[in-house]
Amino acid sequence: MRKYRLSEEQRAFSYQEDGTKKNVLLRQIIAISDFNDVIAGTAGGWIDRETVLAQEGNCWIYDQNAIAFGGAVISGNTRITGTSVLWGEVYATDNVWIDNSEISQGAYISDSVTIHDSLVYGQCRIFGHALIDQHSMIVAAQGLTPDHQLLLQIYDRARVSASRIVHQAQIYGDAVVRYAFIEHRAEVFDFASIEGNEENNVWLCDCAKVYGHAQVKAGIEEDAIPTIHYSSQVAEYAIVEGNCVLKHHVLVGGNAVVRGGPILLDEHVVIQGESRITGAVIIENHVELTDHAVVEAFDGDTVHVRGPKVINGEERITRTPLAGLL
C-alpha cells in the first residue's frame, strides 16, 4: 500500500562532495493516506527519488525544509524532523529519530537511536539506544590505523553530547561522553564518564580506553585538559581530573584519584588501590602506586618519581626522592 506521492514541483539543491559542487533535483513528499500521526494531504520533506523513503512502515520526513537524496534510504518507523539533510548512501531504519542533523557518506543508523542537532559523516554504525546531541560531530575514517576494516561505532545506551568522535573510535555500554575529542581507536564503554566543559575538552586518542565506572574530567582552569594517549587505560572506579597526561602504557584503576596538575604519567605506570596523586607530578619508568600511597606536590613544587619503584602502604611522597633524580 502506497502512503505518499511525489509532487510535480521540483526544487534544485546544491551541495559539495569531495570538493566538487553538485546539483540534485528534489520533489516533495505528499501523504495520500492516514498513517501514524500523518494525515492524508500532509506535505513533508523533499527527496530525489521514491527509493529514498519506504512506502511501508511509519517512516516520514516531517519538516518541509528537510531533504534526503543521493542513495539515502529511510525505512521502518524512522522520524526525520527539523531541517535535517541525509545523503550519500545513508541508511536510517527501525525506530530512529533524526532531528536538525546532517547524516552523510555511508552512515548506518538503526534500532532506537536519537540524533539531535549533530553531524554524522562517513561509514559508521550507530545503533541500540544511543543518543547523540548538542552539536556533536561524528566523522568516521578508515585506513589511518593498522586495523583498516574497523568501523567507528556508537551503540548500546551510550550518550554523546557536544563532542567530536572521529576515525574508528568506539563508544558503547552506558558510557556518557560530554565535551570530548575522541579519535583513532580509542574506546569508552561500560559506565565510564568523560566530562569536559565549555572551556576544556577531554582528549582520548590512539588506543586509549576508559571503562568500568571510571571518570575523566576536565577542569575550567587554563590547560585543565585530561589527555589519554597510546594504550593507556582508566578503569574501575578511578578518577582522572584536570591537567593530566597519560602516555605510554599507563593504567589508573581501583579507587585511585589523579588530580592535576600538571601531571605526567609515562612508561609502564600503574596507579591503583586507594592511592592519590595531586599537584605538579611526573611519574615514569615502571612505577607502581598502590594501597593508600600518596604523591603530592605543593604550590610551586614539582615532584618527579622515576622507577623501577613500588610505592605502597601508607607511604607519602611530597618531594622528589633522590633516586628519582638518577
Curated annotation (Swiss-Prot):
Pfam families noted in UniProt: B_solenoid_ydck
EC number: 2.3.1.-
Repeat listed as a keyword: yes
CDD domains the record matches: LbetaH
Broad class of enzyme this protein falls into: transferase
Any one Gene Ontology molecular-function term assigned to this protein's record: nucleotidyltransferase activity
Keywords tagged on the record: Acyltransferase, Repeat, Transferase
InterPro entries: B_solenoid_ydck_rpt, GlmU-like, Trimer_LpxA-like_sf, YdcK-like
Signal sequence annotation: none
Gene3D superfamilies on file: Hexapeptide repeat proteins
Family statement drawn from the similarity comment of this UniProt entry: Belongs to the transferase hexapeptide repeat family.
NCBIfam families to which the protein is assigned, alphabetical: YdcK_fam (NF040481)
UniProt-recorded name of the protein: Uncharacterized acetyltransferase YdcK
Organism in which the protein naturally occurs: Escherichia coli (strain K12)
Gene name per UniProt: ydcK
